[in-house]
Amino acid sequence: IVAKNKIFPKFKIDMWQEKFNRDGVDRSRFSMDFYYPFLAGIKNNKKEFLNLLDNYYIKGLGVKCVAEEPWVTIAESSECVISALIHDNEDIAKDIFNDIQQFQNNDGIFPTGYQYDMEIFWPEENSTWTNAAVIIAAHALSFFDSDCNESSVNVFLELRNFFKSN
């Protein structure tokens, strides 16, 4: 009902920025701790998003899970695609999504991750959450490449509009 009527509650964004890293542990090495605040609308600076993305994005492969580790994960890449879309970084979102397509197997399944120094899939699994993240990212992207610009049919466009209004 909220999205349909376009009535968005006002969140205390400052409070969420303060509480996001409440335990004091430095999580700057994990990509999800970079893009989740953007995904949630806690942060919304496009330049900051792009600067932080440089620490994790390996062009041609996807988004690393951990900054210092030589592996990309498909779920993190897909979630980062959605974060990029919400904050008007459509070209980057499309690049990342296109990068991960090479990892889809003949059955249409994506692996959890790829260790690029050793050129192996790691961990050796095809997790359901990874494949769900790819589907959600594909849904989000599909509306940016079509003639349908109705934000009411795309939850991610609704999120972008919501975050811009707060």
Predicted regions and their residues:
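Extended glycan-interaction surfaces of carbohydrate-active proteins
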Residues: 3-73, 95-166
